């Protein structure tokens, strides 16, 4: 019985990997201008808004995954960090980026006007905290040492991360899904 359960889980993990890989390859192939826009990273209102919209469309374009995220390297102070943006990154209720409001605080945040009030948006709001193996993977990707696609399956959570390079800039696109009980179709 244990061998049957283990074998079923293994087949589910491999099938999900194949589905996510095919979906990711199609999304990248069908959306070159959107991928290029994501690769043109700068920490400002326009980028966050554009990235959230692109990632929301990608996550709704294919039922094989529930969420799309872009991970980019950046710095806060002198510390190298990773920032992650998703469809949930939308800055709802924001009217506009306040004029001359760049470089606010230690992390070069910016000021926006939300419902008539000024509000600071900081990089720390978008920090991505990878586990050790993810951090090692991201370090290799952003150092230009690998183009490896990273797949992870754990407790019914599936994620596939794909490095993308454009005009000397590197981003990592991650697509993820959750399957209750780890079964396809359950």
Q: Across the structure, where does each feature detected by a protein language model lie?
A:
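Membrane-proximal amphipathic alpha-helices
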Residues: 9-21, 30-39, 44-47
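Extracytosolic and intramembrane catalytic regions of membrane-associated proteins
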Residues: 36-186
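Structured segments of extracytoplasmic/periplasmic soluble domains
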Residues: 27-30, 61
């Amino acid at each position: 019985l244990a061998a049957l359960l283990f074998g079923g889980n293994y087949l589910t993990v491999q099938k999900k990997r194949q589905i996510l890989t095919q979906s990711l390859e199609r999304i990248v192939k069908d959306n070159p201008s959107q991928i290029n826009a994501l690769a043109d990273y700068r920490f400002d209102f326009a980028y966050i808004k554009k990235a959230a919209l692109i990632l929301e469309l990608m996550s709704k374009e294919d039922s094989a995954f529930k969420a799309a995220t872009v991970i980019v390297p950046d710095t806060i102070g002198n510390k190298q960090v990773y920032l992650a943006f998703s469809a949930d990154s939308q800055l709802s209720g924001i009217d506009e980026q306040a004029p001359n409001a760049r470089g606010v605080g230690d992390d070069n945040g910016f000021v926006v006007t939300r419902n008539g009030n000024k509000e600071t948006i900081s990089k720390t709001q978008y920090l991505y905290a990878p586990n050790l193996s993810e951090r090692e993977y991201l370090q290799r990707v952003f150092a230009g040492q690998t183009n490896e696609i990273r797949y992870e399956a754990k407790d019914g959570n599936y994620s596939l991360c794909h490095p993308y390079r454009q005009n000397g800039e590197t981003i990592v696109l991650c697509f993820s899904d959750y399957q209750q009980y780890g079964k396809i179709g359950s």
